[in-house]
Amino acid sequence: MDSENCSITENSSSHLERGQKDHGTSIHFEKHHEGSIQVSIPWAVLIVVLITSLIIALIALNVGKYNCPGLYEKLESSDHHVATCKNEWISYKRTCYFFSTTTKSWALAQRSCSEDAATLAVIDSEKDMTFLKRYSGELEHWIGLKNEANQTWKWANGKEFNSWFNLTGSGRCVSVNHKNVTAVDCEANFHWVCSKPSR
């Protein structure tokens, strides 16, 4: 019996010398190698699953771009347009607008706009009109609508006015403020609004 006890003691001591710690009935191995990282198995599995999921998601997104190129091109071209307007110009719906701080006659205001490769504002929709009224405030601003010698009303870009908004007054040039769109004398001195497409 003594020889059995001796062999167990020798085995136990030789295992303890190699890094084992005896904690009662369970034995826990702790091997420390220089430069190694110890990660428990559940954490290792979680990391592998996350990396795999990320790779699958990236592959799925790239495959979607090739299977539905029209959808991605449409989103990229329409949603990511950044208007480039000069300083002091305001960007709205792919158009640059300039609201003057001085006053001039309609003809001189149109000339000032031309110097910036623009015209007095041409308004195509109710939304554009709401935008101009809001920014004009209480001050009268020239826009690019004029009646040449009692003929048809035309915009500064040459298009005919189709009477889509109510125009009051008896003048031949049109101004706008936050409430009204009015035909007034072209020689009056008002602020003005220039417009041109954004780049």
UniProtKB/Swiss-Prot annotation:
This is Early activation antigen CD69. Constitutive Ser/Thr phosphorylation in both mature thymocytes and activated T-lymphocytes. Residues 62-199 are extracellular. Transmembrane protein expressed mainly on T-cells resident in mucosa that plays an essential role in immune cell homeostasis. Rapidly expressed on the surface of platelets, T-lymphocytes and NK cells upon activation by various stimuli, such as antigen recognition or cytokine signaling, stimulates different signaling pathways in different cell types. Negatively regulates Th17 cell differentiation through its carbohydrate dependent interaction with galectin-1/LGALS1 present on immature dendritic cells. Homodimer; disulfide-linked. Interacts with S100A8 and S100A9. Interacts with galactin-1/LGALS1. Interacts with S1PR1; this interaction mediates S1PR1 degradation. Interacts with JAK3 and STAT5. PANTHER family: C-TYPE LECTIN DOMAIN-CONTAINING PROTEIN 180, EARLY ACTIVATION ANTIGEN CD69. The chain crosses the membrane at residues 41-61. CDD domains: CLECT_NK_receptors_like. GO terms for biological process: cellular response to xenobiotic stimulus; negative regulation of T cell migration; negative regulation of T-helper 17 cell lineage commitment. The gene is Cd69. InterPro entries: C-type_lectin-like (IPR001304), C-type_lectin-like/link_sf (IPR016186), C-type_lectin/matrix_domain (IPR050828), CTDL_fold (IPR016187), NKR-like_CTLD (IPR033992). Gene3D superfamilies: Mannose-Binding Protein A, subunit A. Residues 1-14 have a biased composition (Polar residues). Its main location: membrane. Disulfide bonds join C85-C96, C113-C194, C173-C186. Glycans are attached at N150, N166, N180. Disruption phenotype: Deletion mice develop an exacerbated form of autoimmune disease due to an enhanced inflammatory response associated with Th17 lymphocytes. Induction: By the activation of T-lymphocytes. Keywords: Cell membrane, Disulfide bond, Glycoprotein, Lectin, Membrane, Phosphoprotein, Receptor, Signal-anchor, Transmembrane, Transmembrane helix. Expressed on the surface of activated T-cells, B-cells, natural killer cells, neutrophils and platelets. Present also in eosinophils. Residues 1-20 are annotated as: Disordered. Residues 1-40 are cytoplasmic. GO terms for molecular function: carbohydrate binding; identical protein binding; molecular sequestering activity; transmembrane signaling receptor activity. One of its GO terms (cellular component) is external side of plasma membrane. It comes from Mus musculus (Mouse). It is a single-pass type II membrane protein.
